[in-house]
Amino acid sequence: MYLMLKSLLGKIVYYSYFVILKPIPQKFYKYIIIILEKFILYTKKISMGHTIIVDQQIKNISFKIYVRKNNSQAHYVYTQLLDGKKIYEPSIIVCLNSILKNEKKPVFADVGAFVGHYSCYVSKFLNYDLPVYALESNDKFCEDIKKSASLSKISNIEVLNCLLSDKKEELFAYDVTVMNPDELQKKKLVDSDYLKKVLKFGKKKFTTTMDDVFKKKKIIPNILKMDVHGAEGKILFGSKNLLKKNVNYLLMELHTSKDLEKYSPGFTKADIIKGLIDLDFNCHIISPHSDGHRNLIATDRTTQQSYLNNTSKLKYLKIEKDLTASVLYDRNFSDIFILAIKKEINITSLDCF
């Protein structure tokens, strides 16, 4: 019923605009476009002042996401998914499906869990009592994850509110990032207005390492998903024991060199890949992922379903250690989806390839 009403409303709006615009001289169209774009922008800003609950349905898996008011990034992502036709980051979901089926006893950790999309999805997919770990630096997002889990009737997500790094230090958690504002200011990597927001609204806390977080746990993850907006260098180099001894799969968004310079100073993309290879992983670039403009939502439902059903296969490019810099050289316009797999596991054992 919802889709029928939406289609009918779309037709009414289209024909109404057609009737209104037809008599107007074409030279005025550019001004009309500017006005409409501003109208859409203001509408989005107003909508962000409200909390929304977004129903997610990925094949036979259903869950809910709690999107708090004024969470601009969550509103940007999830308002695109309200009609239920598309899913977020389909390539990662498809790859994750194959891994969860392939691993004998999967234990999942969502590093940079945001509002709980992957944590809720994996919990529903596995449907057992082992914990799903959701690691998040932002206090408010941690509360959002708990609300998403509660709305989805999920009880096995363990939310870990922590700032991760490669060593013990004091950093600020602000929005989706963790940073040292003094270092950013010294290197002039962000503007002064942004720094003022960080200092005013950010939370200053001591960091820990992922090795230390899971040293205290009886059940250790063997699958990691990581989206930490440029902090992946510092976090991974503080996770060497976990990666070496326990993790079989790492699904990671490798961010741009600019993001790494801000949030993982001293680490390059090549450092990260070579570090993983030294820890007995094979690293692969997976496509499709982004269209180059950070658009991480499938262009159409048919394409999305073909990957979910494995009738279309993901493509991979293995990164050889001595060619790492060359392979990554011209891939800096958007985030890259990296799948790192322990060397004894053949990537072709995953049915998404």
Predicted segments with their positions:
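S-adenosyl-L-methionine
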Residues: 2-154, 196-200, 217, 285-353
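Short internal loop-to-helix segment that lines adenine-nucleotide cofactor pockets
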Residues: 78-109, 158, 167-172, 181, ...
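Short, conserved loop/helix-junction motifs that constitute active-site signature segments
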Residues: 122-127, 239-247, 276
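Core alpha/beta nucleotide-donor-binding catalytic domains of modification enzymes
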Residues: 146-147, 151-180
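Conserved S-adenosyl-L-methionine
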Residues: 160-162, 281-290
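Conserved beta-strand signature within the Rossmann-like core of class I S-adenosyl-L-methionine
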Residues: 247-255
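Short, flexible/disordered intra-domain loops and linkers
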Residues: 258-269, 294-302
